[in-house]
Structure formats: C-alpha cells, structure tokens
Design a protein with these regions (language model features):
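Glycine/small-residue-rich loop that forms an oxyanion/phosphate-binding "nest" at active or ligand-binding sites
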Residues: 135, 139
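Short, intrinsically disordered, charge-biased short linear motifs at domain edges
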Residues: 179-188
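Short beta-strand segments
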Residues: 32, 89-93, 155-161, 165-167
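ATP-binding/phosphotransfer module of carbohydrate and carboxylate kinases, centering on a glycine-rich
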Residues: 2-87, 97-100, 118-126, 140-150, ...
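A charged helix-plus-loop insertion that forms the helical arch/lid used to bind
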Residues: 101-112
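General beta-strand structural signal in soluble alpha/beta enzymes
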Residues: 128-132
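Glycine-rich beta-alpha junction loops
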Residues: 94, 160-162, 178, 201, ...
Length: 322
C-alpha cells in the first residue's frame, strides 16, 4: 500500500510503507542520482537491468546544468529500451520534501528544493516516484539482495556520502517528511569533524568518501589500512546504536567505500558492533556486504517504482513471473 497521510495514522503510529510482496508486472525506468555520478536504466520484473547509462554529476551551482546531464541519460535509455517502461522510480540523496516533490541533496550544490519529480514526469510522460537513495537500496536489498527474506534490517550506503534505510516488521520506515533512516547524521564522534549539516562528528563527516579524502589529502580509494579500519569502526558504532534502539539484527552495507575497503572495513565494523551491542537482544547483530554490487542503486530505484504502484501486501518481496 502507498504512504498514508499523517491524518490517517493512529496516535503514536509510525508512518511506513509495506515492502511487498510486489505483484506489479512489467519493466520500469530506474534513476539513481548521487554526488559523484548519476545513472538511469530500465529494469524488468525480476530486478534485471535491461539497459543502462551513466554520467558524472555536474558540480555546477546551476540547477539546470545538473538536470541537463540527467535528461541526456534518461532519454538515452528510453530510446534504447526494447520495451517502454510503465513508470519511473528514483533514488536521490537527501534530504527531500515529503513525497519526494522536491530534493535538496547535500552533495549536489545546484539543487535546493529542486522539483525533481515534476521535471522527470514532464520529461518521461509517466508517473514518477522519488525516494531517498539509501531507502531505495533498502528496498532493493530486500527484493533481490542480501536482506532477502529478512523482515527487520538496516541498509546503508557508504560512498561519497552516507545514508540509510530501515525496514521493521517488513515495512520501510518513512518518518514525518520521508527522511527516516538518515544514519549519516548520527553522531559517532561528539568532538569530531565539522559536517555539512552544521553539526560535528556525524558519521558522514567521519566515514564518507568525501570526508576521508579531505582528512587524508588523497582519494578515498587510496586510503591505507588504518583509515579503512577506522571507517569500519565508525560505521559499526552507528549500526550498534540503531540495533540497540530498534531491536534489529542485520545491517546490509553497500557503496563504493564500504565495498572497496572490503575485509578491513567489515572486520573493524564487526568488532565495534560486538563491543557496543551488549544487550542480549542486540548481541546477534550482523553486518554484511550488500548483495547487489554496482547494480544496487538501479535495482533499488526500480523497487521504489514498483512499490509506488500500490500493488503490495504482506511482508517480503517476490519476483514477477515475467
């Protein structure tokens, strides 16, 4: 079912969206927009990418220049697709206005309250559903990835920035304005580095690719073992806080930094989780790499489109037969 208006919620009920099973058939247009790159693709009913294009995200302050780059790859995949998509799903960095009407990604300077949904709908001539990119990943990992079959989990992206999405009782948490799960701004070092949000010591300021490059003076991909392990420790600290708070026992972590740092990152994260999850219900908490690899952002965006169809019920995502 689709998100319900706040007025339809019982007192104290958290607004959520059911993650499945999804019965909507057919292909969808999937769009992922990040601070470093943007990508568009056509995805079928089993989560397979039929065609895709990507481009670097412009660093311009001009919102139209950023959208022009997006327009080029979207029109490219629509022209190359053997089957016309039925609807469009978008994963974009946050924060964003409720329902994804406007987006203000912290790592895309040119977009502040940019009307992305309306502009894409006008471009594509189809319904467009926009959500946070990490929440999109959470849907994708539950559909065909490392969280498939799990009803309670945290999904994270550790890349240019850090984001997250939370699924509890088989339902994706939205929150008041649709930004639930924004784990990048959980404080992991109270007197830590300044963050773009205005705070200090946020996970994104300590463990994102941007923060690591700024602190070391070289690309995050060239970080030595101590930096890779510190990144994992910071992420493990944040995961432990979420596990202790929400009684979930699985964190799935994707993104170029986390996956690129590999065992150094995940071993350090596991050690930190073991150190900080002392309560009996939290001790089994696991952290594992995302199962979708480089396809994760587009599969997640496709899951956003399929969820937006409204044809969902129960817990757990299933494949279409086509």
């Amino acid at each position: 079912m689709a998100s319900r208006p706040a007025g339809d919620l019982s007192a104290g009920e958290v607004p959520t969206r059911d993650i499945g099973p999804v019965t909507h058939s057919g292909v969808v247009l999937a769009v992922d927009i990040g601070g470093t790159k943007m990508e568009a693709g056509v995805v079928d009913g089993r989560g397979r990418i039929v065609v895709r294009e990507r481009a670097a995200t412009p660093t311009s302050d001009d919102p139209e220049q950023v959208f022009a780059a997006l327009r080029e790859i979207v029109t490219g995949v629509l022209g190359a697709s053997p089957v016309p998509p039925e609807r469009c799903g978008v994963g974009c960095g946050g924060p964003m206005g409720h329902g994804g009407e406007t987006v203000s990604p912290l790592n895309i300077r040119g977009w502040r309250r940019f009307p992305l949904r309306e502009r894409l709908a006008d471009l594509c001539g189809m319904d467009v559903v926009v959500d946070n990119d990490a929440k999109a990943l959470a849907l994708g990992e539950g559909w065909t990835g490392a969280a498939r079959g799990s009803a309670d989990y945290l999904a994270m992206v550790v890349s240019t920035g850090v984001g997250g999405g939370i699924v509890l009782d088989g339902r994706l948490l939205d929150g008041t304005a649709g930004n639930a799960g924004h784990i990048g701004h959980v404080v992991v070092e109270p007197d830590g580095r300044p963050c773009v949000c205005g705070g200090r010591g946020c996970l994104e300021a300590e463990a994102s690719g941007t923060a690591i490059a700024a602190a070391t003076g070289r690309p995050a991909a060239e970080a030595d073992e101590s930096v890779r392990r510190r990144c994992g420790t910071m992420v493990g600290r944040a995961v432990a806080s979420v596990a202790n708070l929400l009684d979930l026992q699985l964190a799935v972590v994707a993104g170029s930094v986390a996956l690129g740092y590999g065992d150094d990152f995940f071993d350090a994260a596991r050690q930190e989780i073991a150190l900080r999850c002392g309560l009996e219900f939290a001790r089994p908490t696991q952290i594992r790499p995302g199962g979708l690899g480089a396809d994760g952002p587009l599969v997640g965006a496709a899951a956003v489109a399929r969820l937006g169809s409204g044809l969902v019920a129960g817990a757990g995502v299933v494949e279409d037969g086509g």
